[in-house]
Amino acid sequence: MSPAASSHALKHPPVKAPSEPAGVDSDFPELGVAIDRARRRGRGAQSNASGRYEAEARVAFDDGWQSLEELPPFTTSVGVDTSRKVITRNDSPDIGFDRSINPYRGCEHGCVYCFARPTHAYLGLSPGLDFESKLFVKPEAPALLEKELAATGYEPRMIAIGTNTDPYQPIERERKIMRGILEVLERAGHPVGIVTKSALVVRDIDILARMAKRNLAKVAISVTSLDPKLARSMEPRASTPPKRLEALKQLSDAGIPTTVMVAPVIPALNDSEIERILDAAAHAGVKEASYVLLRLPLEVRDLFREWLMANYPDRYRHVFTLIRDMRGGRDYDAKWGERMKGTGPMAWTIGRRFEIACDRLGLNKRRSKLTTDHFSRPKRNGDQLSLF
């Protein structure tokens, strides 16, 4: 290891953040050291601080022998997730599904606000740059899914895909794990709801259209901003806003129920775009819409604050003042029933604006409903063939 790339083990707390720009709150927390811009080009996070379960923090430092600028950029590596099950269960009372699939761990889209980032800490990796550059694929996901659907006693309900990490992130283009999963679900007549930020979803429009005709599929695409600069900064490797809107149009034209998700809504950053995003989505043929306020659990809070300081320092104080107004004076409140929409006058105003715009555009007049009536349990090895 070159001197410039030397690593130094530090007991927590982590290294203090770089000096704050004028006007930033004096209570800005201690954060990881920001990685040189050239090394993290095309990434969302500014740093790669250790996860919350690590006993020591490791940071690169320049000891004067070489320049940190000579260190290589963060490249994407892909490992294998050997999990023996692919369906994850949940009993959260404020979400509309009880099971989900995530074909990948980590997400190359690099959305700085992603609430799934803290899950990388379970792997001993950073929720920062590691989350978007050290990915894990579940190559056996389609086979595992078929096995779980075939299990005695399995009760079909809609499976949500993309609730944690995006199933159509860039590596899906070559891995095609998601397409394999859809093929299994189509054969079994099992309903699926997909959430993505990627226009790659239209690759599978053939399968989705056939499933939609049987009320087995619907797709939600998140559009966070129509401002290309803001979108590129917050979601560096996700599809551009125009491509997402075009994907919504293609899906809608194919008869696939579509939803636009205005998510996350960030006060003083993108909340002014709510009506314009809904207008554009309705023009693309979307019939349903939803929104979610910015969520900052665990390490996401500090990663978002770093990003905000680096990109919009003049808005930092205002953004967090409004966030706290909607979160009971805190940066985040994980209370069920409130974590998605927040509380207080600002949260109420955002909700009313969203509702008024949806009424004006005729959105959410009818909700698409998926069915389990077509479910046929996959045959397992050893199952007798039916004679009738």
Give the residues covered by each predicted segment.
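Short hydrophobic alpha-helical runs that function as membrane-insertion/retention elements
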Residues: 193, 259, 289-291
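Internal, well-ordered alpha-helical scaffold/interface segments
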Residues: 242-249, 253, 263, 272-284
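Auxiliary Fe-S-binding modules of radical SAM enzymes
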Residues: 1-82, 88-89, 272-388
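Glycine-enriched alpha-helix->loop->beta-strand junction motifs that scaffold or abut catalytic
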Residues: 213-216, 257, 283-287
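A structural motif corresponding to the C-terminal end of an alpha-helix
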Residues: 184-190, 247-257, 326-329, 353-364
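Conserved strand-turn element in the central/C-terminal portion of the radical SAM core barrel
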Residues: 226-228, 235-237, 250-270, 293-296, ...
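Conserved Radical SAM active-site core
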Residues: 66-105, 109-220, 224-232, 240-253
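Active-site glycine- and acidic-residue-rich loops that bind
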Residues: 199-202, 266-275
